[in-house]
Design a protein with these regions (language model features):
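Short glycine/proline-enriched loop/turn "hinge" motifs that connect secondary-structure elements
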Residues: 57-62, 122-123
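Conserved acidic
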Residues: 5, 9, 80, 125
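Oligomerization/assembly interface segments of phage tail-like spikes and tubes
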Residues: 61-75, 127-138
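Mid-chain, well-packed structural core segment of small domains
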Residues: 74-97
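Small/polar-rich, solvent-exposed N-terminal microdomains that initiate assembly or binding
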Residues: 1-57, 95, 99-102, 106, ...
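A structural signal for the main folded, soluble domain(s) of proteins
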Residues: 29, 56, 79, 127-130
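Acidic-leaning, charged glycine-interspersed low-complexity segments
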Residues: 90-141
């Protein structure tokens, strides 16, 4: 088991989302890998939690990453947040799969989404959609 591709996978997903024109039209440059301070206004995309398990086989060391990408907004209703969630999904499913600096992304699957109303740190209501993905990576530099 290896976590060797953890940083490379996050960097590739971040680059794909940050460079996607359709997503940029909806959120500008608001794609983050850390929660912005306070409760930022508007809508943003956040790379979030990740769980990893061994997925090595006879041909390569590998891992299965289960990761969450969130859409957070202070806008009324879920419609705008859902449009952003669709753009995230479209960006990640567009071929080719994102290239990794180390190893290879074998597959990336959407698993589920959960939309919720929450209270921000200032007490204001925010909406959040958590998109869950499963990624299979292999470390082709290690046999």
């Amino acid at each position: 088991m290896s976590y060797a591709q953890g940083e490379a996978l996050q960097a590739a997903i971040y680059a794909r989302l940050a460079g996607d024109p359709a997503l940029a039209a909806l959120v500008g440059g608001a794609v983050h890998d850390a929660v912005p301070p306070g409760t930022p206004p508007g809508t943003f995309v956040l790379l979030g939690e990740e769980r990893v398990r061994d997925a090595s086989d006879g041909t390569a060391a590998g891992a299965e990453h289960r990761l969450t990408i969130s859409v957070v907004t202070d806008a009324a209703g879920f419609r705008g947040a859902k449009a952003v969630a669709v753009a995230v999904g479209d960006a990640l499913s567009a071929p080719p799969l994102p290239a990794l600096a180390r190893g290879r992304l074998v597959a990336l699957w959407f698993e589920r989404a959960e939309a919720r109303r929450l209270r921000g740190s200032d007490g204001a209501e925010v909406r959040r959609i958590d998109l869950s993905y499963r990624a299979r990576v292999e470390d082709v530099s290690v046999g």
